[in-house]
């Protein structure tokens, strides 16, 4: 029985990156061999075991043979005669098909070391095309290692295009697509994930609402990048920068960033490049997207709010106190202040996600937050103690909040609109 460290741990170690998870392959052993040494079996379809002390995963070496459609139709063989080379042959990319024995020796049967040096994401074998999920995985690795200069090998890109055109992507479950996408949203460059899917033809299959933004123009005065898909990717980049060191729900903010302008794909051609009413128009495609991938209600609600109200927030200085209160009530800022903060981050990303506007200030955030704080000082208990009942309590609460917002707005607006 021989044990090897495999996959991402070896890859990241060689890239001088922090190793987060360590996976092991066991060659020349049976399930009984590991069980007798105290390992705990957790895999059903093929034996995966947890180490009795470290709880790291140890899998018996195996081969896989395609026996159906999608990413689940595989027959596994995990007999003790399976070699390390055979096991590594089923990996997706050469840089993931590296192994290291307990003495530190590296095993590279498929050119992974060379591809690491050349910063290439290359498939191990033609069997890559048997699993459509690998299109998303490669796009995610491109998003992860973009800053290190990694690119996708041309022959691998061709296979990804073939898979995208084959209809195999439609066999992927919504949950699996979202799992890969959510992981990609948390990578350093998630925009590369979506750009890669677009380039190989997968975006149109999996995210048609987002793909529809390609070629939709914006006014050059406000959007020098013009193309709405390009703008959306720039907004996503900014959302990453704004959330990387915050407590905000990163995946929710970044997902909302890619949804915020979906309504622009529905703009009548005769009024382009203007997009009157795109905010409300974007709610339905966002809802369809969320429901198709069975996303949590909190993520869907947040994305829809970002679609419908981001322009209100951009125009905060123009809004009357009554309108601001309606906005606060619709956003439920009283019970969900953290969601309000996150929405403001999406609005900042939207403003900065334009060519040449990456460093602009966004005073609307502080302005609205101060108005929210002033309205928050209105005490509902005081209203109740003064004898108001039922609907009259709500009406009086709104009236007093409007007064508070008006007063604070009058005091601070000149400072924001005439900073000199």
Curated annotation (Swiss-Prot):
InterPro entries linked: CCA_bact, HD/PDEase_dom, HD_domain, NT_sf, PolA_pol_head_dom, PolyA_RNA-bd, tRNA_CCA-adding_enzyme
Gene Ontology biological process: RNA repair; tRNA 3'-terminal CCA addition
Binding site for ATP: 8, 11, 91, 137, 140
Binding site for Mg(2+): 21, 23
EC number: 2.7.7.72, 3.1.3.-, 3.1.4.-
A family per Pfam: PolyA_pol_RNAbd
Co-factor requirement: Mg(2+); Ni(2+)
UniProt keyword annotation of Transferase present: yes
UniProt keywords, alphabetically: ATP-binding, Hydrolase, Magnesium, Metal-binding, Multifunctional enzyme, Nickel, Nucleotide-binding, Nucleotidyltransferase, RNA repair, RNA-binding, Transferase, tRNA processing
Catalytic activity: a tRNA precursor + 2 CTP + ATP = a tRNA with a 3' CCA end + 3 diphosphate; a tRNA with a 3' CCA end + 2 CTP + ATP = a tRNA with a 3' CCACCA end + 3 diphosphate
SMART domains for this protein: HDc
Cofactor binding note from Swiss-Prot or TrEMBL: Magnesium is required for nucleotidyltransferase activity. Nickel for phosphatase activity.
Binding site for CTP: 8, 11, 91, 137, 140
Residues annotated as domain HD: 228-334
Record-level Gene Ontology MF annotations: ATP binding; CCA tRNA nucleotidyltransferase activity; cyclic-nucleotide phosphodiesterase activity; magnesium ion binding; phosphatase activity; tRNA binding
Note: A single active site specifically recognizes both ATP and CTP and is responsible for their addition.
Domain notes: Comprises two domains: an N-terminal domain containing the nucleotidyltransferase activity and a C-terminal HD domain associated with both phosphodiesterase and phosphatase activities.
Role this protein plays: Catalyzes the addition and repair of the essential 3'-terminal CCA sequence in tRNAs without using a nucleic acid template. Adds these three nucleotides in the order of C, C, and A to the tRNA nucleotide-73, using CTP and ATP as substrates and producing inorganic pyrophosphate. tRNA 3'-terminal CCA addition is required both for tRNA processing and repair. Also involved in tRNA surveillance by mediating tandem CCA addition to generate a CCACCA at the 3' terminus of unstable tRNAs. While stable tRNAs receive only 3'-terminal CCA, unstable tRNAs are marked with CCACCA and rapidly degraded.
Subunit structure: Monomer. Can also form homodimers and oligomers.
Family of this protein: Belongs to the tRNA nucleotidyltransferase/poly(A) polymerase family. Bacterial CCA-adding enzyme type 1 subfamily.
Protein name per its UniProtKB record: Multifunctional CCA protein
């Amino acid at each position: 029985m021989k044990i090897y460290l495999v996959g991402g741990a070896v890859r990241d170690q060689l890239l001088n990156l922090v190793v987060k998870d360590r996976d092991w392959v066991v060659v020349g052993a049976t399930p009984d061999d590991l069980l007798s040494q105290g390992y705990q079996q957790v895999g059903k379809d093929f034996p995966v075991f947890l180490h009795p002390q470290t709880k790291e995963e140890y899998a018996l070496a195996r081969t896989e043979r395609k026996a159906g459609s999608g990413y689940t139709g595989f027959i596994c063989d995990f007999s003790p005669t399976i070699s390390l080379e055979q096991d590594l042959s089923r990996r997706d990319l050469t840089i993931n098909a590296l192994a290291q024995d307990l003495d530190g020796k590296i095993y590279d049967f498929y050119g992974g070391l060379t591809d690491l040096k050349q910063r290439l994401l290359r498939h191990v074998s033609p069997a890559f095309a048997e699993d459509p999920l690998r299109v998303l995985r490669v796009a995610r690795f491109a998003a992860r290692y973009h800053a290190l200069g990694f690119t996708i090998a041309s022959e691998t890109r061709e296979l990804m295009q073939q898979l995208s055109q084959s209809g195999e992507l439609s066999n992927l479950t919504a949950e699996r697509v979202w799992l890969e996408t959510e992981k990609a949203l948390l990578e350093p460059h998630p925009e590369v994930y979506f750009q890669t899917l677009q380039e190989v033809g997968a975006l149109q299959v999996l995210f048609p609402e987002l793909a529809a933004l390609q070629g939709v123009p914006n006014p050059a005065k406000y959007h020098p990048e013009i193309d709405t898909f390009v703008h959306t990717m720039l907004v996503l980049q900014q959302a990453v920068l704004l959330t990387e060191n915050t407590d905000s729900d990163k995946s929710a903010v970044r997902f909302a960033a890619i949804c915020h302008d979906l309504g622009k794909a529905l703009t009548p051609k005769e009024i382009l490049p203007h997009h009157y009413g795109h905010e409300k128009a974007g709610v339905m495609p966002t809802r369809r997207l969320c429901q198709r991938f069975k996303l949590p209600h909190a993520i869907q609600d947040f994305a829809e709010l970002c679609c419908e109200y981001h322009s209100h927030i951009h125009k905060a200085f123009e809004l009357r106190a009554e309108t601001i209160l309606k906005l606060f009530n619709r956003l439920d800022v009283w019970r969900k202040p953290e969601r309000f903060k996150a929405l403001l981050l999406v609005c900042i990303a939207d403003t900065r996600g334009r060519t040449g506007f990456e460093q602009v200030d966004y005073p609307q955030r502080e302005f609205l937050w101060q108005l929210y704080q002033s309205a928050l000082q209105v005490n509902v208990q005081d209203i109740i103690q003064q004898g108001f009942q039922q609907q009259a309590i709500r009406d009086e609460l709104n009236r007093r909040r409007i007064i508070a917002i008006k007063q604070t707005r009058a005091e601070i607006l000149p400072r924001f609109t005439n900073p000199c």
